[in-house]
């Protein structure tokens, strides 16, 4: 149990997808203007990461890995395209669910919802799972931990950006300039967790 708690904490804080690896930055910067929308996208990314990492783990271990299907067959050259296919299918299902049951969130996310398919944070989580050779239960913990870490980062940035609307920001730094500086400072703050030994 300690191993899974350690893996979860590491995925959320120490190896944060947005602030340690800088993955998923296009949606991270574009959707972080409003906390409510950022939280909705964070939930969507968490769901997709939490489902795609374990599903791709099964596909990788039982279909693509060398000798998985039969002796002498190695389909690992299909890793990337297969991982992207599974992610795309999950995003399409999520998009249909949000359109049907949460239309206001669906409209608020706009074009960024289908872009989760090519969000490099999702693909990065799946790639790290394969590279680090996580088993199925570890991939569940890692997927949800990575999603929660990304959601935490985007909600924190959105709340800071909402407060900065009322701040006296120098004219040359307004908009994305101060957002990049803020993201860098947040990354430095999260880097302090790297000294924690789990």
Curated annotation (Swiss-Prot):
Membrane-spanning ranges: 11-31, 39-59, 77-97, 109-129, 140-160, 176-196
InterPro entries recorded: NqrDE/RnfAE, NqrDE/RnfAE_oxidrdctase, NqrE
Topology of this chain in the membrane: Multi-pass membrane protein
Catalysis: reaction(s): a ubiquinone + n Na(+)(in) + NADH + H(+) = a ubiquinol + n Na(+)(out) + NAD(+)
Major localisation: membrane
Subunit structure: Composed of six subunits; NqrA, NqrB, NqrC, NqrD, NqrE and NqrF.
Compartment(s): Cell inner membrane
Enzyme Commission code: 7.2.1.1
Name the UniProt record assigns to this protein: Na(+)-translocating NADH-quinone reductase subunit E
Cellular component GO terms held in the UniProt record: Gram-negative-bacterium-type cell wall; plasma membrane
């Amino acid at each position: 149990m300690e191993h899974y708690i350690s893996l979860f904490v590491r995925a959320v804080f120490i190896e944060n997808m947005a602030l340690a690896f800088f993955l998923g930055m296009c949606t991270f910067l574009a959707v972080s203007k409003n906390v409510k929308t950022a939280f909705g996208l964070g939930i969507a990314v968490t769901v997709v990461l939490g489902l795609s990492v374990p599903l791709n783990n099964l596909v990788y271990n039982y279909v693509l890995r060398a000798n998985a299907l039969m002796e002498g067959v190695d389909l690992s050259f299909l890793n990337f395209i297969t991982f992207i296919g599974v992610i795309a299918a999950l995003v399409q299902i999520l998009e249909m669910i949000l359109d049907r049951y949460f239309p206001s969130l669906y409209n608020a996310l706009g074009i960024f919802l289908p872009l989760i398919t090519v969000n490099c944070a999702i693909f990065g989580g799946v790639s790290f799972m394969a590279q680090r050779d996580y088993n199925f239960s570890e991939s569940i913990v890692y997927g949800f931990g990575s999603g929660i870490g990304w959601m935490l980062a985007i909600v924190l940035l959105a709340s800071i950006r909402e407060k900065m609307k009322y701040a006296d920001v120098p004219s040359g730094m307004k908009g994305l300039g101060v957002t990049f500086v803020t993201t860098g400072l947040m990354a430095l703050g999260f880097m302090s967790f790297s000294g924690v030994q789990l």
